[in-house]
Swiss-Prot record:
This is 3-hydroxy-3-methylglutaryl-CoA lyase, cytoplasmic. Residues 48-315 form the Pyruvate carboxyltransferase domain. A divalent metal cation binds at D57, H248, H250, N290. Pathway: Metabolic intermediate metabolism; (S)-3-hydroxy-3-methylglutaryl-CoA degradation; acetoacetate from (S)-3-hydroxy-3-methylglutaryl-CoA: step 1/1. It is an enzyme of class 4 (lyase).
């Protein structure tokens, strides 16, 4: 190939490049170095809370049942990364979501680390009661902005779901158990197509009014763009303050990080993600996984935003679960790291 230019001879390999960009150490502890401070973009929150949904939303769509001990080990590994919220399981009927049939065993088996919250999903009062009996101290309810999706996902209309949620939330508040609310199909539905921002706002407002401390707005099938994200959030934020909102983006069309950046620029500072980009949706064929936690942290680190999460440790947890379920990671950052080790 002839003589290479001297600059090319000294080109950094992937591993060196990763070390330049995968910030940890002081940033994990909450302090930013000079380079990180210089990279901060104006108008963005200084801190972003990441809600890790891999053990629940990420694994629920796996066709092969993941052994309970693998789920427990994944959660325990994630608990040591600096993540403050890890959604661990769902107290739904095993007939509808067989992957979550071991919810009580998972709750009993995990080690609950100080400073980490472990919410679970509960679709109705019975699920809530089972969750509390298993030791849950925080729950979430999951509604939809699409009538068709609500009927497919939780087997009832939106109006009927609100009645169920009111029962759950009232019981939870009586026991001082915080409740998070999910709104699926916030940017599109696999059955109805486009969903109006007004519909998303209506459902979100009702959940917030019932007492949900935070509303997570989900792009369930990953069709959103920064433009549609902006329009939806502008509508919802007329009724709910940005500090009580989160975004939950799937990456079907490769728009998740762009959509998240849009949300951050609008004042949102809570983002859902899944280790290794695990996930999909059992009621939305073709939907790919959640935005990968590794890729999200990499982007946030690169903008000088603090998450308190150690990216290296998240990648280790991702490598563990991908080997356990015989999958290739969906995280671009993890893929780059793996390729670097092959050099």
């Amino acid at each position: 190939m002839g003589n290479l230019p001297s600059a090319a001879k000294h080109c950094l390999n992937y591993q060196q490049l990763l070390r330049e960009h995968l910030w940890s150490g002081d940033s994990v502890a909450g302090a930013l170095d000079a380079a990180q401070e210089a990279s901060q973009l104006p108008g963005l929150p200084e801190y972003v809370k990441i809600v890790e949904v891999g053990p629940r939303d990420g694994l629920q769509n796996e066709k092969v049942i993941v052994p309970t001990d693998i789920k427990i080990e994944l959660i325990n590994q994630l608990s040591q990364t600096g993540l403050s919220v890890i959604e661990v399981t769902s107290f739904v009927s095993s007939r509808w979501v067989p992957q979550m049939a071991d919810h009580a065993e998972v709750m009993r088996g995990i080690r609950q680390y100080p400073g980490v919250r472990y919410p679970v999903l509960t679709p109705n009062l019975q699920g809530f009661q089972h969750a509390v009996a298993a030791g849950a101290t925080e729950i979430a309810v999951f509604g939809a902005a699409s009538e068709s999706f609500s009927k497919k996902n939780i087997n009832c209309s939106i109006e009927e779901s609100m009645g169920r949620f009111q029962e759950v939330i009232s019981s939870a508040r009586h026991m001082d158990i915080p409740v998070r609310g999910y709104v699926s199909c916030a940017l599109g539905c696999p059955y109805e197509g486009s969903i109006t921002p007004q519909k998303v706002t209506e459902v979100s407002k009702r959940l917030y009014g019932m007492g949900c401390y935070e509303i997570s707005l989900g792009d369930t099938i990953g069709v959103g763009t920064p433009g549609s994200m902006k329009m939806m959030l502008e509508s919802v934020m007329k009724e709910i303050p940005p500090g009580a909102l989160a975004v939950h983006c799937h990456d079907t069309y490769g728009q998740a990080l762009a959509n998240i950046l849009t949300a951050l620029q609008m004042g949102i500072n809570v983002v859902d993600s899944a280790v290794s980009g695990l996930g999909g949706c059992p009621y939305a064929k073709g939907a790919s996984g959640n935005v990968a936690t590794e890729d999200l942290i990499y982007m946030l680190n690169g903008m000088g935003l603090n998450t308190g999460v150690d990216l290296y440790k998240v990648m280790e947890a991702g490598e563990f679960i991908c080997k356990a379920v015989n999958k290739t990671t969906n995280s671009k950052v993890a893929q780059a790291s793996f390729n670097a080790r092959l050099e």
